[in-house]
Amino acid sequence: STLARINEQQPAALYQQLFHKLLKYYEHSKVAHKFRFKNPLYSLDASHIDLSLSLCEWAKVHDSKASMKLSIGLNHSNDIPEFVAVENGKENDMVQGRKFQFPAGSIVVFDKGYVDYQWYANLTAQNIGFVTRFRPKSVYQVIQQHPVLESKGILKDETIQLNSAHALKRKAPVLRRIEYRDQQSGKHFSFL
């Protein structure tokens, strides 16, 4: 409680300077992982945070609800968020997702909330790879089938073209679709 009272009296600029010093220090640190990628690996995700409407009227999204959305682009080489945005809780994940600038040659992993075929085309044009879950009702055509390693759980490896009217209008790029079976749970997953 004594420390809390002392901290309460410090100027906000002190904490801002401390944050930037810590960030600079940790930006150049590397985290050891069990996996290795030659390309920079990023995770992109957004979290919906419920707030008290009586305390945070500025975050009102409905008559009785307040919330905000926190979007983060995490660099896995040092486990530090390189991109952070806080927005209105009603905002679609893609609004901030499109704004993040990933370096060419990197790989970005994101969930199904980031479905935007034009964005996929832009990432591909910038030489940025991505991995996301494949929507099961997606309309596509198989262009080519590749050899698979069933012993590793890979059931299908296909080059596909999304060919729904929506995907064609937004110039969805040619994509790679991987179907995988988790050996422990037996569950099937499809990825782009």
Annotate each predicted stretch with a short phrase.
Residues 1-3:
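Long amphipathic alpha-helical segments
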Residues 5-21, 33-54, 63-192:
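Single, function-defining residue in the core of a domain
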